[in-house]
Structures are given as C-alpha cells and as structure tokens.
Design a protein with these regions (language model features):
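Bacterial Sec-dependent N-terminal signal peptides
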Residues: 1-25
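Transmembrane beta-strand segments of Gram-negative outer membrane beta-barrel proteins
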Residues: 23-48, 66-83
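Outer-membrane beta-barrel pore proteins
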Residues: 47-52, 60-71, 110-113
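Short, glycine/acidic-enriched capping/hinge loops at junctions between secondary-structure elements
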Residues: 55, 85-89, 335
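Glycine- and aromatic-enriched membrane insertion/assembly motifs of diderm outer-membrane
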Residues: 65-67, 72, 77-79, 105, ...
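General structural concept
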Residues: 75-76, 83-94, 99-107
Length: 458
C-alpha cells in the first residue's frame, strides 16, 4: 500500500463539518459574556440601572442621561489578564494571556430646554469580550474515534485506527468582542420621571485559533501502512457580526435620596459571516507525511432574547449604595432560518440546534451590588461591588457560576477632569470537551481586569 494516498479521514465528525456546523454553544457564546462599560459603573459591580448618571448610562439605563447637567467627554481603556489552569487526564497545564483594548469613547450634550431636561449622547463602546485561551497536554487511553483509510495502487483500501493511548495536546485562543456604536437620548416626562432610549449599531469580530495534535509516544502504532507517529490539525475561523440593538429605559426619583430604574432590551438579530480555513497532517514513523486543506464561508443569523434590568440606588452626601438585577431567558435564543433556505440540509440542522437550546438552557437572574464613599478632603471617591452570573446551562453546578469582585477609585484631577480606575476579579470552573478530547478537560479560570477612564466636563 502507498501511505501517500490518503483518500479519507474518519473522525467523530468531518473536518469541514466541524468548522461549518453551528451549534447551540455558538449561539449562546456570541452573547453570554456581556459586561458593559463605564469605570464607575463596573467598579460598583455594574449595579448601575438605578444610578446611571454619566456617559455610561447610554448602556446601563439611557434614562439616566437626563440627570446630566454639563457636557461630558470620556474615554476608557481596559487591560485583561486571562489565566486558565487545565486538568486533562491528570496532567496540569497553565496558560496566561493579556489583552489591552479601547473600551469606550463618547460624548454627552444637554440640550437647552425651557423646563425639564433633554440630553443626547453618542459614542463607541465595547460591551463584551471574546478574549480567552486554553492550553493542555496529557496522555489519554480514551478513544476519540480518529482513523484513516489508506489505498494501494490497485485502489484497495483498508481502515486503520489512531484513536487512543497517545499524547494529546490542544491549544485554543480567541480574541475580539462585541462593539456598540450608539446614539441615545433622554427627556424628563415629569419632574420625577426620566425616559430614555439607546439605538446601537452592533459590530463584532472574533478570531478563533485551534491546534490539536496526538502522538504515538510509545510506538504502539507500528504496523505498515498504519505506522502513524503524529496527527495534527489547525483551524482558523474569523466571525464578523452585525446587528441593530434597541434599549428602552426609565428612571423614577422616589425621593431626594432614592431612585428606581428599569430597562428593556429588545430582541436583536445578529448576522454572522464566518470565514474559515483548516489543514491537517499525518506524519509517519519514517518521517514522511500527508495531509489535506479546506476553507470556505458560512452565514447565519442569531435572534437574541429580551432581557430586563431593574435597580434601586440610594445617594447621600457621602455614601451611595445601589443594587440591580437582570432577567434573561437563554432558552429563547435561536438561530433564525429563512423560509427559502429550509430545503438546505445545513439550515435544517439549525432547527435541531434550536431544540437543543430550548431544552438545555434556562432562564437566569444576574444580580449586582455596589457602593461608593466620598472623601472630599482627599478629592477622592472609593468604590466597591459584587456581581453574580449564573451559568445558563440547565445542568450546570454552582462552581460554573461567575462571581465578580470589584473595586476602584476616582480622583478629581482639577475642577473639570476626573481620573477613574476600576479593578475586576473573577474565577470559575468549567468542563470543556470536543471531538478530539471526548473525556473532557476541567478548566479553572482566573480573570482580572483593570479599567482606566478619563472624563472632562464643560
């Protein structure tokens, strides 16, 4: 037989199918890490629905813009450290990456009115991150189903497994996020009630890199022509995302010290255009190799569910306390399938994925708490907060929920300029698996983020 004529790779799923087939995870992943922006807001745990009264109200509650009395210009940068400790087949690995991003750039302008308030705002804001990484290596005796057909000169073929008792290595990195190019406005409908709306052009990009290899380190696969030394695969996927989002907000001044806020985020259709390429390579014991390459494009649309925010804030002379919650039913996320494409098998598969989302995901309530202490003699405000994000998977346990601990401070540089700093820390665990590592990998993730913001009022 000639091992230079590989005619087919038999995997758990085909290589092209692995890259093209969208699944329930893809739909949820595009929207499940929304953390917003705003140095003050995030330093207070994101408990900002009832309190929002700066440029970041454009995201948290557009009605809060109505409390702004001076024009504002603001800019923010973030620095993320993502550390992933992985346990695969009893072998521990650690991967650590950092990502520095422009977080927001925006402008707020009160419009002169005879009475009440009218304020507009516009700007760019990064509201979610796709930045993460994973690396592990370990010996596994669990079959992943990988095997190959080899043909000889007489076109006779024979199948050879290369599926277990090998050293496996996997490395995954993802970078990018969702961005809002937003226009918002707020008006006073009464002396106690503000209403607002934000319209956001949503753009996003995710660059996904995947590398997997498995080696016969004990020379167990040594019978020609199945004397395979190593199999490796590389995948590269770019996802471009477009959509239009609308958020409605209201804020009620219950008393001089107490405010109540709420928002409704309307469903959004996110169109995803994916470009992928892949290559895989078999290396034999004698050093020869053979492989295949593949590439293509894919387009699909995700419909996101409603979500509802509610919050309350107490503001005193020296102390501010706030709390908020967000309700979302993840099971209402779905792939939107045009009627004229139901005849195509790939799109019919998305109907099955919609059923999986409906059955495997659940409704959640996120909650956030925050506080701020003013120290006028130091021209400084100290902030702290906490946020809790339940895992949307129906069968997940508490260790997979995210808890975020936050803190920060604000320095009055001069009468019109504020420098704000926020620090966010969270850790959680998850079990990940794919076609190549069916036994699964336990990941312990530690995330820390520093956000620096500068605002100018005039």
């Amino acid at each position: 037989m000639s091992k230079n004529t590989i005619v087919q790779l038999i995997l758990i799923t085909g290589l092209a199918g692995l890259l093209q087939a969208q699944n329930a995870y893809d739909a949820i992943h595009k929207i499940d890490n929304e953390n917003g922006f705003g140095t003050r807001a995030l330093a207070m745990g994101g408990a900002y629905t009832g309190l929002a009264d700066d440029y970041s109200a454009l995201y948290w509650n557009p009605a809060g813009l109505g409390y702004i009395r001076n024009s504002q210009f603001s800019v923010e940068l973030s620095h993320l450290n993502f550390q992933n400790e992985a346990n695969y087949s009893g072998a521990f690995s650690m991967d650590n990456q950092t990502y520095t991003r422009l977080r927001s750039l925006g402008f707020v302008r009160p419009v002169p009115t005879a009475r009440g308030s009218c304020v507009i705002a516009l700007g760019y804001n990064k509201i979610s991150d796709y930045d993460e990484n994973l690396h592990f290596s370990g010996y596994s005796s669990v079959s992943n189903g990988i095997g190959f057909y080899f043909t000889d000169e007489n076109e006779e073929s024979e199948f050879y497994l290369f599926d277990k008792n090998v050293l496996r290595t996997e490395q995954i990195s993802s970078a990018g996020g969702l961005h809002h190019w937003s226009l918002a406005g707020a008006i006073a409908l009464s002396p106690q009630f503000m209403a607002g709306v934000t319209v956001a052009l949503i753009t996003g990009k995710e660059e996904y890199n995947f590398h997997f290899s498995q080696r016969d380190i004990n020379d167990l696969f040594n019978v020609y022509p199945g004397d395979i030394d190593e199999y490796e695969i590389n995948q590269y996927l770019i996802s471009d995302i477009r959509g239009l989002g609308i958020k409605l907000g209201g804020n009620l001044q219950l008393s001089r010290w107490l405010r109540l806020g709420g928002t409704i985020k309307l469903p959004t259709y996110l169109t995803v255009n994916e470009t992928y390429s892949s290559d895989d390579l078999i290396t034999f014991d004698d050093g020869s190799d053979d492989g295949v390459e593949d590439s293509g494009r894919w387009k699909y649309t995700i419909k996101t569910p409603y979500y509802f925010d509610g919050g309350v804030a107490f503001t005193g002379h020296f102390l501010t306390l706030s709390a908020s919650a967000r309700y979302r039913d993840w099971s209402q996320t779905q792939f939107s399938i045009p009627k004229n494409q139901l005849a195509e098998a790939d799109y019919r598969d998305l109907i099955i994925e919609n059923s999986i989302i409906r059955n495997d995901y659940r409704e959640t309530i996120e909650y956030r708490l925050g506080g701020e202490i003013k120290l006028p003699f130091l021209r400084t405000n100290l902030r702290g907060g906490y946020a809790y994000f339940p895992n949307p998977l129906m069968e997940s346990d508490k260790t997979q929920d995210k808890q975020v601990y936050t803190g920060g401070l604000s320095l009055i540089v001069d009468h019109n300029i504020n420098l704000d700093v926020a620090y966010l820390y969270s850790d959680w665990s998850r079990v990940s698996k794919d076609q190549f590592t069916p036994a699964g990998t336990l990941e312990n993730i530690f995330l820390s983020k520093i956000i620096i913001g500068l605002s100018y009022s005039f």
